[in-house]
Amino acid sequence: MEGPSLRGPALRLAGLPTQQDCNIQEKIDLEIRMREGIWKLLSLSTQKDQVLHAVKNLMVCNARLMAYTSELQKLEEQIANQTGRCDVKFESKERTACKGKIAISDIRIPLMWKDSDHFSNKERSRRYAIFCLFKMGANVFDTDVVNVDKTITDICFENVTIFNEAGPDFQIKVEVYSCCTEESSITNTPKKLAKKLKTSISKATGKKISSVLQEEDDEMCLLLSSAVFGVKYNLLAHTTLTLESAEDSFKTHNLSINGNEESSFWLPLYGNMCCRLVAQPACMAEDAFAGFLNQQQMVEGLISWRRLYCVLRGGKLYCFYSPEEIEAKVEPALVVPINKETRIRAMDKDAKKRIHNFSVINPVPGQAITQIFAVDNREDLQKWMEAFWQHFFDLSQWKHCCEELMKIEIMSPRKPPLFLTKEATSVYHDMSIDSPMKLESLTDIIQKKIEETNGQFLIGQHEESLPPPWATLFDGNHQMVIQKKVLYPASEPLHDEKGKKRQAPLPPSDKLPFSLKSQSNTDQLVKDNWGKTSVSQTSSLDTKLSTLMHHLQKPMAAPRKLLPARRNRLSDGEHTDTKTNFEAKPVPAPRQKSIKDILDPRSWLQAQV
């Protein structure tokens, strides 16, 4: 049988305070060790900022120790007064409201400088270190330290502080601490000071100081740190935030200011603090109760029942057909409001038929909407009734925070300032173009590129990763027929600018295939005309040599596929300008020739015929 499940706060067990007692004692031991480590850091600190942050952390440790001690005393009192009685009456039972999350963020504290102080740049103004402490029960949180001078008009804290286990009666005490950071007031030579203390403090005084640390006297520790290191944070202002201050927007709160103009830590506060305080009760953000219920329906005067998986959360009862619909984020089949106007009645009178029903009545203008549900047994009915009454109590305690779920916005951490992450010298080396590290990395890149392209990177013959769109026209699937042009002695020879040999195409269908006899006739014709074209051949030789030198001096073109030419028929004796013909159409780059082929005189003669 599928029974309901309780997802809210369960009943407190008898051994729970003892477990909390152990956890708090562990936290106390941790803070004591943290405080000892901070004292060691203070003895080694040489910079002003280091001393300021260390003293601030020491104050936080002492505040947490005091809070843990008070909480431990409260738990001991609860154990002594705890009783095991259980009240069966749900209405009159003593209840405890559910816990919730409280988030405080975007704190702004305006300053009220005089015009002469704010706009005056005649001399360097005083600087102050400001931070906030948030205290609620045993929880103590702090913000970052903010430096303030007369040019600042608002003290801004970007931290988001979240209290996870807060009740509706929470009280968050906000304390603003200030310290003047003038060089004369802060000791920056702790080693000399330690040597001086070693020679001037007697053994009896040293034993008193060590006993103070061992006895965990927080006030004496703070006084000792301020006396030795010259840094002391003073309470500048404070306020208390409660449930009435919670709102899903910015709100202004009054501050109680301490000190006056004569105090070294004093700042001209306006008297207000603006922040965003958000409350998320567990009854709004989590499922208070869940289980299967049978809903009664009237269809044409007949009573029928449908089984639904119901979830009680945020002042509403969401009804689904199955639990899987919740994970799939399917819209619920039925939503029943559960608020302070809702009336719930148990109808457990028919013991023979074993029917356990309850009705949910929501008044609306002019009428009342009633939903009847049935459970499987009496135990489930008691659990559902207990969950409803607890939910009513939670809604009444958290008040306006249960009208709508407030969202907690957690901002991403900002980048720290540049001077906190690296030194100026490292930034200079990163920006320098003459850095040996930069040259070495460039050499490695070139060497890697040469290895990847098998040396073709140096001569510009690395192929493209993706061919251009028009490359499909030159995939080699088309036949190419080229008809050579016959040169006469009187005409000037035409020279290919690239001087490269094309791949021999297939012979045309109307021509005879190659034979040795035809080749011998061609050689004989060349020998007969050798004397007549001596001047032309000399010019051709010079042109070939200059072309060769030109190719050796510049990078060679990348090999590409041949251009599929159309089948052109030329009449006998017709002369065609080869250069003009190739300029009219895109010509692919010819194949690369070796040095042996370029220096062969027979290739020069073939280029002219």
Curated annotation (Swiss-Prot):
CDD domains attached to this UniProt entry = PH_rhotekin2 (cd13249)
Naming one, the record's GO cellular component terms include: plasma membrane
What keywords sit in the KW lines?
Coiled coil
Give the Basic and acidic residues compositional bias ranges.
Answer: 569-582
Per the database record, which ranges form the PH domain? 286-393
Biological process, per Gene Ontology? hemopoiesis; negative regulation of intrinsic apoptotic signaling pathway; positive regulation of cell population proliferation; positive regulation of NF-kappaB transcription factor activity; positive regulation of non-canonical NF-kappaB signal transduction; signal transduction
Q: Which residues form a coiled coil?
A: 56-91
> For the REM-1 domain, which residue ranges apply?
5-81
Whether Chloroplast counts among this entry's keywords is no
Q: What induces it?
A: Up-regulated in cells resistant to 25-hydroxy cholesterol (25-OHC). Down-regulated in lymphocytes activated by treatment with phytohemagglutinin (PHA).
- Highest taxon of source: Eukaryota
**Role, per record:** May play an important role in lymphopoiesis.
Protein name, entry field: Rhotekin-2
Organism expressing this protein natively: Homo sapiens (Human)
The record lists the lineage as: Eukaryota, Metazoa, Chordata, Craniata, Vertebrata
